[in-house]
């Protein structure tokens, strides 16, 4: 399976880079993982609603440019569907079973994802109703993908 993790903005924190590198290394035994970073829009702190939409639209265009038509897209969003690790593992397994060999997980910037990206998404997922930095969510996502592969192969892993 080919998994792309598309994020807005460049990851700067060393500790997050190290964690993500560790999980992508572990995942290499199960899938080909590609990290794609698209540039974020520079924006002042206090934006109008119209400016926020414009920022999300520009970032969304960059995201969509990285997704091929045959890719199954899963957007990370607060209002996405919450799952247990076991449910997430089952869904990844079903995607592989039904021939979905390309999956892209999309993590938006600080303002979230554009409507166009959400419309392109085949599915949404939420890890919590809480708000987290999008850079941290990339690490959490990598860990959960790795956990899903371990679950699907009945291999031991932390509970």
Curated annotation (Swiss-Prot):
It holds the Pfam family SPOUT_MTase. It catalyses: pseudouridine(1915) in 23S rRNA + S-adenosyl-L-methionine = N(3)-methylpseudouridine(1915) in 23S rRNA + S-adenosyl-L-homocysteine + H(+). It comes from the Bacteria. Gene3D superfamilies: 3.40.1280.10. Keywords: Cytoplasm, Methyltransferase, rRNA processing, S-adenosyl-L-methionine, Transferase. InterPro entries: Alpha/beta_knot_MTases, RlmH-like, tRNA_m1G_MTases_N. S-adenosyl-L-methionine binds at residues 76, 108, 127-132. One of its GO terms (cellular component) is cytoplasm. GO terms for molecular function: rRNA (pseudouridine-N3-)-methyltransferase activity. Its EC number is 2.1.1.177. SUPFAM superfamilies: alpha/beta knot. It is found in: Cytoplasm. It is an enzyme of class 2 (transferase). Homodimer. Specifically methylates the pseudouridine at position 1915 (m3Psi1915) in 23S rRNA. Belongs to the RNA methyltransferase RlmH family. This is Ribosomal RNA large subunit methyltransferase H. The gene is rlmH.
